Amino acid sequence: FPLLNLRMLHYPPERRVNTEDGRIGCGAHTDYGSITLLSDDGVGGLQVKPREGDWVDISIPEDHLVVNLADLLSIWTNNRYVSNPHRVMNPANTHRYSIPLFVTPPYHLKIETLPTCLAPGETPKHKPMISGEYLQSRFDGTHTYRNELMDDAL
């Protein structure tokens, strides 16, 4: 069974990091698993980076979801479907709320390019990996403060 992680996120208006476009609520990243379903409160702030060009504001119509493709789906499809970089630029003086549902393969599952996503003679662009090991490495890389806290605890 896939792992499902439902989060309820609050981006307060008083963020310290400013840019010309607004306030960073969540820096640029790709999601780790296979897909993410996202609902928000209509305030705005979600941006996606196309392969070429600048960040694009995404408006989610009421009663609709955004579907983000994530890293492990890219591996399965040999980059036919690529995880999309995105970020949140929280509008100034506004609270922002969103509810993402992260869908991830089971922790022990071997992730490798599907044969149907390879053209004749094509080789996979990614090495096979275990889902949970990949997720843990991405989590550790994103949340480096955890390692610092553990070092201080010892």
Language-model features, listed with the residues they occupy:
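C-terminal flanking tails of non-heme Fe-dependent oxygenases
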Residues: 1-154
